[in-house]
């Protein structure tokens, strides 16, 4: 009787430890995933914003997808409002 209770208690403790370890690994995975996404996202934003807001004139063009604003003389997104 004492042996079966001891084995049951040991099994429950072992189950608790395994569940806790796997849960802590699962918590680390989203953090690593989000940090890698934001690292890649920040690299993309640097490239995307490379021309947005840069000073320009009609001789010195902007990046593709941007046009030189006639009013403010900086690069803005191309659209019907920029004509």
UniProtKB/Swiss-Prot annotation:
Residues of the propeptide region, as annotated, are 22-49
| Signal peptide span | 1-21
Disulphide bond pairs: 51-63, 56-68, 62-75
Name the PROSITE patterns on file: HWTX_1
One Pfam entry name:
Toxin_12
**Do the record's keywords include Signal?**
yes
Q: Which GO MF terms are attached to this record?
A: carbohydrate binding; ion channel inhibitor activity; toxin activity
- Record's subcellular location: Secreted
* Tissue distribution: Expressed by the venom gland.
Q: Which UniProt keywords apply?
A: Disulfide bond, Knottin, Lectin, Secreted, Signal, Toxin
What broad class describes the main subcellular location of this protein? Answer: secreted
Q: Which GO terms describe its cellular component?
A: extracellular region
Q: What does this protein do?
A: Agglutinates erythrocytes.
Which family is annotated?
Belongs to the neurotoxin 10 (Hwtx-1) family. 51 (Hntx-8) subfamily. Hntx-8 sub-subfamily.
Q: What is known of its domains?
A: The presence of a 'disulfide through disulfide knot' structurally defines this protein as a knottin.
What is this protein called in UniProt?
Answer: U5-theraphotoxin-Hs1c
Which source organism does the UniProt entry give?
Answer: Cyriopagopus schmidti
């Amino acid at each position: 009787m004492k042996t079966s209770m001891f084995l049951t208690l040991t099994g429950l403790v072992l189950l608790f430890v395994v569940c806790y370890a796997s849960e802590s690994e699962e918590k680390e995975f989203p953090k690593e995933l989000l940090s890698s996404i934001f690292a890649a996202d920040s690299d993309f934003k640097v490239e995307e914003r490379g021309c947005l807001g840069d000073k320009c004139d009609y001789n010195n063009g902007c990046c593709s997808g941007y046009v030189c604003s006639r009013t403010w003389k900086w690069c803005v997104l191309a659209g019907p409002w920029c004509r």
